[in-house]
Amino acid sequence: MSVPHIQHRLDPDDPNTSIKAVIKEIKPELDPENLEFFEFTEGISNKLVGCRPTGGSDQEILLFRIYGNKTELFIDRKKEIATYSILNPLGYAPPVYATFENGFCYGFMVGSVMCPKTVCDPHISSLIAKHVADLHAIKLQEENPQPSWYKAILHFFSIIPDKFPDAAKENRFKEVLASKAYLLEEVKLLKSKLDKLESAIVFAHNDLLCKNIIYNKDKDSVCTIDFEYANPNPIAYDIANHFCEYAGVDEVDYSLYPQKDHQVKFLESYLKRAMELQGEKDVNPSSREIEKLYVHVNQFALAAHFFWGVWGLVQAHYSEIDFDFLEYAITRLNEYYLRKEKFLSLTCE
């Protein structure tokens, strides 16, 4: 079933009024003058506004995502909607009710948003691991899937300006980071090393930060939200990206990167679930299998840092959201260099 498209632009400066103008095209039973609105402020790529009938329940919430400025340069919005259409019947994503010129309307997933503290809870972490395994088991649409992280980084480099128009940004970039050409050669070298790991390519979320994970206490289950970066990628990349996000976004603290004992428990839960889904009789992964995935995940953490570092450079140029993307890029790329030697030296005997 195709998603209805409404020829309408949502006003990021006055979203409530522009939502009222089209609400009856989405839900005819709703009264535009009897709605309560609330804005989610955590996102740094898009603007997200929710509404429901005044005094209504969380189950009645409609979400309106307004795309960030120029995000269409690096996010395939048609593919994003197609991903929701695939995941919704499987119970992994809410329904999409309508698309607009600069966004879409979709359902709300009830539960509590995770944070760097709650995501470390052993029980919740195990639920997340199993859910990630479920996502990775989804059949890919591509016949010969290739890792998207590297292709995306190359694209990012093509749209980063050679020089930031803002003098302060340009000076800060030159002061702290290497040139674009140097960074490009660095990521090519990284890819050549990671390709040797031959981590299986799967359907990957690719943005498993804490606030994209919802825990439903009543059902004792987790789900993931926001699939704009979902694409084929190595298993180890998606898990590594999740571990990197333990550090948070607004106030990044990489001392929160999970220690080995936590990672091992997560990876054991992941592998057990993956084995169940594959119909294996023995669903107890060996210590060697866990150690191998541990090594792969930590080496792919370098790719995740590089991806979001270069992404931050793109956003520093194009985004109109009040967030210091350049400092975020610097933080991620610095973390890449700090971890590089240690992670690439890991081996699984």
Swiss-Prot record:
GO cellular component: cytoplasm
Catalytic activity: ethanolamine + ATP = phosphoethanolamine + ADP + H(+)
Alphabetical keyword list: ATP-binding, Cytoplasm, Kinase, Lipid biosynthesis, Lipid metabolism, Nucleotide-binding, Phospholipid biosynthesis, Phospholipid metabolism, Transferase
Subcellular location: Cytoplasm
Gene Ontology BP, a term: phosphatidylethanolamine biosynthetic process
Pathway: Phospholipid metabolism; phosphatidylethanolamine biosynthesis; phosphatidylethanolamine from ethanolamine: step 1/3
Key word Transferase present: yes
Class of this enzyme: transferase
Domain of life: Eukaryota
Record GO terms (molecular function): ATP binding; ethanolamine kinase activity
S-S pairs: none
EC number in record: 2.7.1.82
Keyword Ribosomal protein applies: no
Identification of the protein by name: Probable ethanolamine kinase
